[in-house]
A protein has these predicted regions:
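A structural preference for long, well-packed, hydrophobic secondary-structure segments
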Residues: 85-86, 108, 122-125
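Short catalytic micro-motifs in class I SAM-dependent methyltransferases
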Residues: 107-112, 140
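Class I (Rossmann-like) S-adenosyl-L-methionine-dependent methyltransferase catalytic domain
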Residues: 1-50, 55-95, 131-277
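A short, conserved alpha-helix within the catalytic core of class I
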Residues: 112-128
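A conserved beta-strand element that flanks and buttresses the S-adenosyl-L-methionine
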Residues: 104
């Protein structure tokens, strides 16, 4: 996995918009435990413990042992409720409570695809769907097939506005060029850069703000799957209880403020699955 150079900036970003990240709490009737996959420093678990003390048993899972150490320190100092912390393997070995648990996968899937192998990605989906969780809550980034399509004038207008922004912010211009090269795009001439699809533009707009950990963020694939592909993964023993595909309001406002681009493309989704008994 790509190194996180500034854990403080990374975890600060993770803490923002907790109300949106805990969108599923009023929809998981009967669940007794919340298992947060990719718990990072435990901020979301702490938020739930503070907002709803002792309503749920709380468990955090992360593949990054450095993050688990941060979570342990953070939660021991700031949280009254006992919260268990595990790697996925440790959780699978000891847990017998998935049947009445809600698995939360917030901004996890794109990281699994960015850093995983085909084998580890398959293992991830097996863990998600075969552990018997009562609910599975997923919140991440994805575009739909229809949103990827955009005519050249829309792409050109967005590139022009990004170029204007980069002229005012040379560091951002450097990031944009690095992003394009990493995405296997290329210069047509000295003054113009070709982006192959509207997806490339949206992908950049999703990540340009993360300058501190840019080397890591640049290489992550925020959009590994279309929403249609996500929905096709739902197995027959789960039903879709809630689904929303939307544009993150803060992102839309920030892109308009920085670039003057009206980002109407849906970039994020929430999906709640309920096990069929």
């Amino acid at each position: 996995m790509e190194r996180i150079y500034d854990y403080g900036t990374y975890t600060d970003g993770m803490r923002k918009s907790m109300a949106d990240k805990t969108w599923f709490l009023d929809k998981i009737e009967g669940a007794k435990e919340i298992v947060d996959y990719g718990c990072a420093d435990g901020a979301l678990l702490q938020y739930i413990a503070d907002a709803m003390p002792n309503v749920f048993d709380l468990t955090g899972i992360d593949i990054d042992e450095e993050m688990l150490k941060l979570a342990s320190v953070n939660l021991s100092c700031n949280c009254d409720q006992a919260i268990a912390l595990f790697t996925p393997k440790q959780f699978s070995d000891i847990s017998a409570s998935a049947y009445v648990s809600c698995l939360n996968c917030g901004s996890v899937i794109h990281e699994v695809y960015s850093y995983g192998t085909p084998e580890s990605i398959e293992e991830f989906w097996k863990f998600v769907f075969n552990s018997g969780f009562q609910y599975i809550a997923i919140r991440d980034m994805a575009m739909s097939k229809i949103d990827i399509l955009a005519n050249y004038s829309v792409i050109y207008d967005a590139l022009r506005k990004i170029s204007n922004y980069n002229q005012r912010n040379p560091a951002a211009g450097k990031q944009f060029n690095e992003f394009l090269h990493y995405e296997f795009l290329h210069y047509i001439d000295a003054d113009r850069i070709e982006a192959s699809t509207w997806r490339d533009i949206v992908h950049y707009l999703l990540k340009y703000r993360y300058a501190t950990n840019w080397d890591r963020e640049m290489k992550e694939n925020y959009l590994p799957l279309l929403t249609e592909e996500i929905l096709l993964k739902v197995p027959s023993n789960y039903r879709i209880k809630y689904y929303e595909h939307y544009t993150l309001p803060y992102l839309k406002d920030k892109v308009m403020e920085d670039f003057g681009i009206d980002l109407n493309t849906k970039t994020h989704y929430k999906l709640l699955l309920e096990r069929i008994d």
